[in-house]
Amino acid sequence: MTIVYDGGVLIAADRGDRRVWADHRVRLEAGLVPLTTAPVVAQVSRSPRQVPLRRFLRGCEIAGFTSDQGHGVGALLAKSRTSDVVDAHVAFTAAGAGSSVLTSDPADLTALASHLRPRIVVHSL
């Protein structure tokens, strides 16, 4: 089983968080390619000078955001009474992939996860 990274994980990687990098390396060495989403990349990418971020992303699969997913994400936001489209897309992507989520903000993603089937597990940094 792989994992989906949220923006907090990418920010930590960009800042050189050794624990995040070590965890990422272990996953890759085990043949598990982590996922993140294009909206998450857009949320954290600010400059081509973010070399650590770009290096980290080379070891990730980046899921797009389709119009069909947009309807599912919108329905999830309505059910959960939340408004963060990026977090909702992370949760929706994880559920679709049968994955769990690694996040720096477990409260928001746990609230979303409770409205998804199949359920996803939310892990905190």
Task: Report the location of each language-model feature.
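Acidic catalytic patch
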Residues: 60-80, 92, 106
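Alpha-helix capping/helix-boundary segments
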Residues: 9-10, 40, 69, 89-90, ...
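Short, well-structured N-terminal submotif of metal-dependent ribonuclease cores
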Residues: 1-36, 45-58, 125
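Phosphate- and divalent-cation-binding pockets in alpha/beta enzyme and binding domains
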Residues: 43, 72, 111-112
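Acidic, metal-associated active-site segment
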Residues: 84-100
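Short beta-strand scaffold positions
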Residues: 36, 64, 85, 103-104
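Acidic, PIN/NYN-like endoribonuclease modules and their adjacent C-terminal/linker elements
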Residues: 95-125
